[in-house]
Structure formats: structure tokens, C-alpha cells
Amino acid sequence: LIQNSRARVRRETIVADVRVRAPSVDVRTVGAGGGSIAFVPELTKALRVGPESAGAVPGPACYKKGGEQPTVCDANVVLGYLPSDVQLGGKMEINRDASVMAIQTLADAMGIDLMAAAEGVIKIVNESMFGALRLVSVEQGYDPRDFALVGFGGAGPLHANALGVLTDAWPVIIPPGPGVLCAYGDATTQVQDEAARTYLTMASDLTDAQLAEDL
């Protein structure tokens, strides 16, 4: 969350079971991306998405790199959100037939039609992303309606409008080159160093001169 041109920072981060006591930008991750695998458990017959991912290799079925499991990317292709008549990066072709075959396995498992299955995948992943947005806004005391929503990353713009509707955030902004926005920021942002140390003393003994001398 960015307010007054400054990103929110937290002093410690928990990675798995490790508490990292170092300042970092307050980022909340969610196991939902273009490569997240959708599946229907035999026991519940309820559609689920992620956290397992097909990654870049073998990737979604539409990449034709060996991946056959249905992913969020394949659902976007089936629904036409990701056109199959364009080349990713000017080189990679999208195979819609492969996406249809992958998503059809979900439809057959749930006894619904192809489009309904694809829509179900997208609705689930949008709700997962919405939950992450709530963590950095509503649960921190901020109203998302007071902010614009920026969609970036490889698949972010595909879901940005739906998330704008869910959060009532306006406007929804898609920056130029959304797939490389993080890399661009990493290359151009100013480096900031911080240092801290513990200083123990009695308040009655503390003076400006003593503090300057000790530190």
C-alpha cells in the first residue's frame, strides 16, 4: 500500500517459521498466479486453485511445454481474457485448444460446462487476491475506496478490473510494461540504509550531550 508517495514499511517479516527482524516493504503474498494449478478433489468435488503452481516450465497447458494440468492462465485463455491470436513476447504462441482440454477436465469432474469451469477458476483466484488486498488495507485501518489500484506483473492486469470492483478502488491503473514493473523499480529506486542499536540508560541521567557522545 502506497500513501503520500511512500510505501508502507514493516520492521519485521515472517518467512515460513523464521522471523526476520529487518525493515522491508509491507508486501503480502498469495498463492494465486497465472501458473496456479486448479483441481477438483475426489472427496469434496469442490473446485480449488493453488497453491501448487506449474511455474514457467512446464507451465500452463497453453504454453505447450509439457504442462497438461489446468491453470489460471488456461482459464484466462478459454474465457478470451488472454487472446490466443497474439504471441507472448513476440515469440511464444498460445495454444487455446490445449487450454480447452485442460479446463474441460475440471468441467467433467464437476459436471458443468467448459465456460462455467473457467469462470469458477477466475472467481476463486480473484477472491484470493482480494483477501491479500484486505490484509494491507482494511485490516490496517485503510479504506481501499480512498486509493487507486495498480495492476502489474505478468497476469496482474488480467484481474485488475475485477479486483477494482471487489474493493471499490478507483481508478484501476495499468502501467506501461506491467510485466517488468518490479524489475524497473529495482533498477531505478534509491537505496536507503538504516542502522539501529540498543541504548540502555536511566531517563534521569539522559542529556542531549550524553546521548550525542554515546551514540
PLM features: residue spans?
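N-terminally biased helix-coil "hinge/interface" segments that flank
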Residues: L1-L215
